[in-house]
């Protein structure tokens, strides 16, 4: 079934005679795609019949002609084929193309892993983004191991997983796909006999048939705790093992290994974070009960991991007392062990480990978590993870002191590091809520306690005075004699649960309280007062939690420096920051700022906000930690993490960074252990590079800043002019995209809109970006750039394109901005988008708006290529270019089918099968694009 493997005209292999490794990798990728395509084709024919397979192939070939040549005859043929299909056949066709996208992604991912391995085993020079490269750079700059260890003592690199609903695949589907990936990996790594090759292919066939017979779509809506459980899967896949391994590898490189003194050990700097189960902004289903359940699920996952590792460690530490000496600490642990087996009487390390296991099992039982294996006897629960770690450290010291350090460097070392990184809470859970909810809650409490306050009517200065007075007061603001609204009761219940979590799991369990849509100083003080009510802040100025403003809109980004300047000048708030080690975190929102002002202006205002915040924090003597709320798509701040971090203005990283990992990006980065390790290494290397090796980077020349300011203003005008100022644009958007149908997918627990309106302002950023990706316009990732470049060149004929090209070559920020736009535009298709435009019933509106979009697209591509000095999109990114050419012949038909189904769905009586077909196309297109939300 070779016709269902590659595009009709096979892509030419790269002409790299001097690069045999790259050529071999390319060949192997094509072979893997051929293999999986053949197996899928056989599956479609066997399960659905030859007629369905022939239909798939006919649609694919016609779609290629239309896409490649803009062939109007092919377009008519395609429409005729689609019109003639039954609803049942349509669903089968969609599933075939969707699964090919999934399988092509697997082959690509395995090829990336293959190339990473080749780079490591062949002894080639380390590439940018690898720690080896960054450490070599540091050595060349005269930065030694001791200085680097000092850096990591206060460093923080924290990927924060969120449940943003952009991962459309079910976990069952992902599990099967991981099985297929493992089988491909086996073919790569293991020297198989002919019989084993046959067995491997048979297993692949079973997996693909199982995939074909598995529901692609969720039949029920996810609950928040479902999302929590899904998120925890990535700890099993990657984090629980790779986070400790990365620390240990870096420690070895810096000389803090086996026999190192305590002060030479590398501090744990890589900390996992999560919003899943703690993000209440717009999600009424995140309650105190859900917060409690989330923390319990997280703790259960990490304690079971520790117990499993202790069980294995006990098996390994069979050292006999007459063959190895032990320390007094280990002797005491062995004597306290409830393990009285005569077989282990002379195996003190095993006795010590079984005692630790018993104590940890008792800890799990105290937290109402069932352990995997019953302990050998009863023991006292650990009061904290520090006590658990102290016992592990005692075993480590004894082994090292008695010539068994090589044993200490195995499983025990990894477990000690895991305990340090994950504690008993696994990941730090952020709480997040909208500032408007805090405002209403405080207003109700204030009006009950101070009836004359009229909190909602008074100005910002009066609010600040009232709130700071409350922070100084030891008297509670709430009263058991007042009946509060359900919203206020719910908010206070969540905060009380957070305080209880600190007592149960430690302060690291919930270290941040984030305020979305922060617009003023009072927004932060309101949260401080609420936290004081539950004991997380006391009147003396000590705080057990960080209060984090989130600046999201263009206007709020522009005001962020002034807000933080005034806030840090308030003694009551400054004391809270000082009690937290003099560190203040600020979160920057990439998604809403993009929806508000467009891609160019969002990127520029974020950059300027960082520069302003750096200056303000230096003035106040406070350490700034930035938390980047980036999405998967470029329209929501996505793009290569290394480039994004290194392109930050000088002083923005300063050793600490937090960054969101959302939706389908979590899966692509962390479902495979090797890929996950590589991505964690990239974050670490970029943080080190931006902090130590580029701290005094020369600021961009004034001309560049001025040009960027002008480009931003021009792009802003074009973007706002289309999205917010064009009559009928809202109608065009709702008619020409799948925004309505997206809400029928069971991909998340959160509603798509903040309010029940059709206004763009009220729409969440994710469905906004997701919808434009589905219709292949990707408008949030580029619109306005072309107009801005044309207008700027017209206003500066003396500088023109050469000046902008110098700006691109010399300024990392501008280079990263354009590189991301290059990626977005390469995935767009005006031909396909024109078919979605035909769904708009008003022909005049359709012609006017799509005409503007088409003209802006051409202007943006022309401007981008001129500035980059390229002849075509992705000229500087051959890997992505190749990827798109492999996958898109199977992606484009899904768009054509989706348009046809949308037309039927919107013009006929409701049909469950047609709606299911639309949902399947959304799934398949999302998989093909890879970062669509």
From Swiss-Prot:
GO terms for molecular function: magnesium ion binding; phosphoenolpyruvate carboxylase activity. Its EC number is 4.1.1.31. This is Phosphoenolpyruvate carboxylase. PANTHER family: PHOSPHOENOLPYRUVATE CARBOXYLASE. Forms oxaloacetate, a four-carbon dicarboxylic acid source for the tricarboxylic acid cycle. It comes from Rhodopseudomonas palustris (strain HaA2). SUPFAM superfamilies: Phosphoenolpyruvate/pyruvate domain. One of its GO terms (biological process) is oxaloacetate metabolic process. InterPro entries: PEP_COase (IPR021135), PEP_COase_bac/pln-type (IPR022805), PEP_COase_Lys_AS (IPR018129), PEPCASE_His_AS (IPR033129), Pyrv/PenolPyrv_kinase-like_dom (IPR015813). Belongs to the PEPCase type 1 family. The active site is at 164, 595. NCBIfam families: PRK00009.1. It catalyses: oxaloacetate + phosphate = phosphoenolpyruvate + hydrogencarbonate. PROSITE patterns: PEPCASE_1, PEPCASE_2. It comes from the Bacteria. GO terms for cellular component: cytosol. Gene3D superfamilies: Phosphoenolpyruvate/pyruvate domain. Keywords: Carbon dioxide fixation, Lyase, Magnesium. Its cofactor is Mg(2+).
């Amino acid at each position: 079934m070779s016709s269902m493997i590659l595009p009709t005209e096979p892509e030419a292999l790269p002409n790299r005679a001097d690069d045999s490794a790259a050529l071999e990798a390319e060949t192997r990728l094509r072979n893997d795609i051929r293999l999986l395509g053949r197996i899928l084709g056989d599956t479609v024919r066997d399960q659905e019949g030859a007629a369905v397979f022939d239909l798939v192939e006919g649609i694919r070939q016609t779609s290629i002609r239309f896409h490649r040549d803009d062939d109007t005859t092919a377009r008519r043929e395609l429409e005729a084929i689609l019109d003639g299909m039954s609803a049942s056949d349509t669903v089968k066709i969609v599933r075939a193309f969707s699964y090919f996208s999934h399988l092509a992604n697997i082959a690509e991912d395995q090829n990336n892993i293959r190339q990473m391995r080749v780079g490591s085993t062949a002894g080639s020079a380390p590439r940018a983004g690898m720690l080896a490269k960054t450490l070599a750079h540091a050595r060349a700059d005269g930065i030694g191991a001791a200085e680097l260890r000092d850096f990591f003592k206060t460093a923080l690199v924290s990927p924060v997983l969120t449940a943003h609903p952009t991962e459309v695949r079910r976990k069952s589907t992902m599990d099967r796909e991981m099985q297929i990936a493992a089988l491909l990996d086996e073919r790569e790594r293991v020297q198989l006999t002919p019989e084993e090759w046959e067995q491997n292919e048979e297993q692949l066939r079973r997996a693909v048939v199982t995939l074909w017979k598995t529901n692609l779509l969720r039949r029920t809506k996810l609950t928040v705790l479902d999302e929590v459980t899904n998120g925890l899967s990535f700890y099993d896949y990657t984090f629980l093992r790779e986070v400790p391994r990365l620390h240990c590898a870096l420690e070895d490189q810096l000389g803090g290994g086996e026999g190192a003194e305590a002060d030479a050990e590398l501090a744990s700097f890589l900390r996992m974070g999560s919003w899943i189960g703690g993000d209440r902004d717009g999600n009424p289903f995140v309650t105190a009960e859900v917060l409690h359940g989330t923390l319990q699920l997280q703790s259960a996952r990490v304690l079971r991991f520790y117990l499993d590792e202790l069980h294995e460690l006990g098996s390994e530490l069979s050292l006999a007392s007459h063959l190895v000496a032990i320390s007094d600490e280990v002797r005491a642990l062995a004597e306290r062990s409830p393990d009285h087996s005569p077989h282990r009487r002379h195996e003190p390390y095993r006795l010590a480990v079984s005692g630790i296991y018993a104590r940890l099992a008792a800890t799990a039982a105290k937290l109402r978590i069932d352990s995997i294996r019953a302990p050998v006897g009863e023991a006292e629960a650990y009061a904290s993870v520090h006590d658990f770690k102290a016992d592990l450290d005692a075993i480590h010291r004894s082994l090292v002191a008695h010539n068994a350090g090589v044993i200490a460097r195995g499983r025990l070392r990894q477990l000690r590091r895991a305990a340090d990184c994950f504690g008993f809470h696994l990941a730090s859970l952020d709480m997040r809520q909208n500032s408007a909810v805090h405002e209403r809650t405080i207003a109700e409490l204030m009006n009950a306690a101070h009836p004359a306050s009229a909190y909602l009517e008074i100005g910002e200065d009066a609010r600040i005075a009232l709130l700071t007075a409350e922070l100084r007061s030891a008297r509670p603001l709430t009263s058991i004699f007042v009946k509060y609204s359900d919203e206020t009761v719910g908010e206070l219940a969540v905060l009380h649960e957070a305080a209880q979590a600190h007592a149960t799991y430690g302060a690291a369990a919930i270290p941040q309280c984030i305020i979305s849509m922060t617009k003023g100083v009072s927004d932060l003080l309101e949260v401080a007062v609420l936290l004081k009510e539950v004991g997380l802040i006391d009147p003396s100025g000590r705080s057990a939690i960080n209060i984090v403003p989130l600046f999201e809109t263009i206007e709020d980004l522009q005001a962020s420096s002034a807000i933080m300047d005034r806030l840090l000048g308030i003694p009551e708030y400054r004391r809270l920051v000082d009690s937290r080690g003099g560190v203040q975190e600020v979160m920057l929102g990439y998604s809403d700022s993009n929806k508000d002002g467009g891609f160019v202006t969002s990127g520029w205002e974020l950059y300027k906000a960082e520069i302003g915040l750096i200056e303000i924090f230096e003035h106040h003597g406070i350490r700034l930690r930035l938390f980047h709320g980036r999405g998967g798509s470029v329209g929501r701040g996505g793009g290569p993490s290394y480039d994004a971090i290194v392109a930050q203005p000088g002083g923005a990283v300063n050793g600490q960074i937090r960054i969101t990992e959302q939706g389908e990006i979590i899966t692509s980065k962390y479902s495979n252990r090797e890929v996950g390790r590589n991505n964690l290494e990239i974050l670490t290397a970029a943080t080190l590079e931006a902090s130590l090796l580029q701290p005094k980077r020369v600021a961009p020349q004034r001309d560049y800043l001025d040009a960027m300011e002008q480009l931003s203003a021009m792009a802003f005008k074009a973007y706002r002019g289309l999205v917010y100022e064009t009559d009928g644009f809202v109608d065009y958007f709702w008619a020409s995209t799948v925004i309505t149908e997206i809400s029928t997918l069971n991909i998340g627990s959160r509603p798509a809109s903040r309010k029940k309106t059709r206004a763009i302002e009220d729409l969440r950023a994710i469905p906004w970006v997701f919808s434009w990706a589905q219709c292949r316009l990707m408008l949030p990732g580029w619109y306005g750039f072309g107009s801005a470049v044309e207008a700027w060149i017209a206003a500066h004929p003396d500088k023109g394109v050469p000046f902008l090209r110098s700006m691109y070559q010399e300024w990392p920020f501008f280079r990263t901005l354009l590189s991301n736009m290059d990626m977005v535009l390469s995935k767009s298709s005006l031909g396909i988008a024109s078919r979605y435009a035909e769904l708009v019933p008003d022909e005049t509106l359709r012609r006017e708006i799509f005409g503007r979009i088409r003209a802006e697209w051409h202007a943006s591509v022309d401007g981008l290529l001129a500035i980059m000095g390229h002849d075509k999109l992705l000229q500087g990114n051959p890997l992505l270019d190749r990827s798109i050419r492999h996958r898109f012949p199977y992606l484009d038909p899904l768009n054509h089918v989706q348009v046809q189904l949308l037309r039927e769905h919107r013009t006929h009586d409701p049909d469950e099968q047609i709606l299911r077909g639309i949902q399947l196309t959304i799934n398949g297109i999302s998989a093909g694009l890879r970062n669509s939300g």
